[in-house]
Amino acid sequence: MNLSDNDVPAWWRRLGLPGLVDLHTHFLPERMLRRVWAHFDEIKPLIGHQWPIQYRDNQESRLATMRRLGVRRFTALSYAHRPKMAASLTDFSLSLAAEHADCVPSATFYPEEGVLEQVQSALDRGARVFKIHAQIGAFDLREPILDPVWGLLADAGIPVVIHVGSGPVSRPGITGPDKLAGVLARHPLLTAVVAHLGAPEYGEFLDLAERYPWVHLDTTMAFTDFFERLAPFDPALLSRLADLPDRVVLGSDFPNIPYPYAHQLESLERLRDREPRLDDDWLRAVCWYNGLRLIGE
């Protein structure tokens, strides 16, 4: 299999789908995006590999790429790394969604004074998905100031894409499955979407998905050749992944990926060679139905 981006529409048509739903894509203010790309340009000393950005284009070109691929619903995920950033990032993401109907209204938050009010405001303005990045933000998900936020989002049934796995760079005391486990113990109905399948702690995050009915896992970068070098997925866990067909959603990390978008899809399709239950029905659920259900459509 050697899928190219030009082949992607034929790929999802073969599955009988009207397109793709990708819950882990990034659209950021230009200045912040340039800083993110600069970070990836310098990441080799931390992970041992270069990370060349595949889609280093302007915003209109990136939107056009999403549509050319047939991504019918995508997110504008952002994340704050310090106080007094989250509100403006949410404003940007919600404004983008207001201008582009295929962009899911997205928001973020940070453990700071007024966070509950910020999250409520985002919900009032139509936010359908939130994103936080504990590793970059350098905060513990269990911080007391966030407890009412988790309760609010659990009650609202709004998904939160959470990067709390220890990959690609561990942050002791901040990352790891125990942080999310602490939140879920208090808010068991939280719709938590674990980014990158929780890499590299795949098994521990599968434990949480098996224990809590609203924990989901996104496929972002998982199983790609690039990520298998950094955080290989234990083949012995594939049967457990297949046991949760309604709990896995497509994520890609577009545009900040070091390979064509199509490679994420072919990486998922080739899993059937090792676990036959990860078949076309599984791909349909992952690439369309599960994500659509989470965003309430």
What are these regions (language model features)?
Residues 24, 66, 93, 122, ...:
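Conserved, mostly hydrophobic/aromatic
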Residues 24-30, 163, 196:
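Histidine-centered divalent metal-coordination motifs
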Residues 1-23, 30-73, 244-249, 258-297:
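Mid-to-C-terminal alpha-helical segments outside catalytic/metal-binding sites
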Residues 20-23, 75-77, 106-107, 131, ...:
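Active-site neighborhood of phospho(di)ester-bond hydrolases with catalytic His/Asp-centered motifs
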Residues 3-4, 128-129, 142-249:
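Catalytic pocket-lining loop regions of alpha/beta-barrel enzymes
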Residues 72-73, 81-168, 173-175, 216-218, ...:
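Active-site gating/metal-coordination segments in enzymes
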Residues 90, 115-116, 180, 201-205, ...:
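Short, well-ordered alpha-helical microsegments
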Residues 65-68, 121, 182, 207:
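Well-formed, non-transmembrane alpha-helical positions, independent of function
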